[in-house]
């Protein structure tokens, strides 16, 4: 099924406002913008594989609608341990403007049952840190990608422990470069998102969740009305560490790599 520009824009609004809360969680602005760019740039009819976690959203692919002009295959890599938590985020997508694209299949990352060299583009959106077997994941990313095909990875550098116990590690872009290159994936474009001031805001948001409800409401209003706008402004104004060289403080990053073997 094909969707209109208006439908996709409304879907994007749901993701931004209800799912990713991009006004408060700056990590995911980068993810949404890059996915939409990749959808626009990918050749119509090309094969796009998304390795993601759809169980918690009721079995839907959040990014599937953007690839409605492609041969889109989504693989839910949620482990069996996630079954107990179930679709606990489904309420966030219960909206008429959310485009429901069901996950194609659910399979462990060690055995996705996809053919070798099937994908022109492989998407790994916010998944890497939820996979216990990193060796299997990185090899699968390479195995299913066609020679000269592309692999897109989005990962946070700053996150609380979440979806416990299925939260295993945090990469830097440079660590991701190393493991990608070992399986023939050469990074060709990297983007960083956020800075030290949005990191402060993110930590505040996490801390507020530990307060009792009434105190939380009062403190949230104080923080987001009086301080959050200033922190976001500083993040765009002050982008270089003036004390230490070779230092950055992103809250997330994306890498686009090409399969060279």
Language model feature labels by segment:
Residues 1-44:
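Class I SAM-dependent methyltransferase Rossmann-like catalytic core
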Residues 47-111:
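Class I SAM-dependent methyltransferase SAM/SAH-binding core
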Residues 123:
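A conserved beta-strand element that flanks and buttresses the S-adenosyl-L-methionine
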Residues 135-147:
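A short glycine-rich, Lys/Arg-flanked "PGG" loop and its adjoining helix->strand segment in the class I
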Residues 149-155:
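Conserved beta-strand signature within the Rossmann-like core of class I S-adenosyl-L-methionine
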Residues 159-182, 196-199:
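Acceptor-substrate binding/catalytic loop of class I
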Residues 185-196:
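Conserved S-adenosyl-L-methionine
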Residues 198-261:
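A C-terminal cap/extension of S-adenosyl-L-methionine-dependent methyltransferases
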């Amino acid at each position: 099924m094909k969707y209109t520009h208006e439908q996709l824009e409304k879907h994007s609004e749901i993701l931004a406002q209800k799912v990713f809360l991009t006004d408060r969680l700056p990590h995911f602005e980068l993810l949404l913008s890059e996915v939409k760019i990749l959808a626009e740039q990918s050749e119509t009819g090309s094969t796009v594989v998304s390795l993601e976690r759809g169980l918690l959203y009721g079995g839907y692919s959040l990014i599937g609608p953007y690839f409605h002009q492609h041969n889109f295959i989504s693989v839910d890599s949620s482990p069996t341990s996630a079954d107990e938590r179930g679709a606990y985020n489904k309420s966030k997508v219960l909206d008429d403007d959310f485009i429901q694209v069901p996950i194609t299949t659910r399979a462990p990352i060690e055995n996705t049952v996809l053919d070798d060299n099937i994908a022109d583009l492989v998407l790994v959106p916010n998944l890497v840190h939820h996979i216990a077997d990193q060796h299997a994941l990185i090899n699968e990313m390479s195995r299913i990608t066609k020679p000269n095909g592309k692999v897109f990875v989005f990962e946070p550098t700053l996150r609380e422990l979440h979806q416990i116990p299925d939260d295993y590690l945090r990469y830097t872009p440079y660590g991701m470069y190393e493991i990608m290159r070992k399986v023939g994936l050469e990074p060709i474009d990297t983007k960083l998102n956020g800075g030290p001031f949005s990191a402060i805001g993110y930590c505040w948001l996490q801390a507020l969740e530990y307060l009792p409800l009434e105190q939380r409401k009062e403190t949230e209003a104080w923080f987001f009305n009086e301080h959050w706008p200033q922190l976001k402004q500083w993040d765009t104004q002050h982008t270089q560490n003036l004390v230490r060289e070779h230092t950055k403080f992103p809250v997330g990053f994306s890498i686009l790599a090409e399969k060279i073997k």
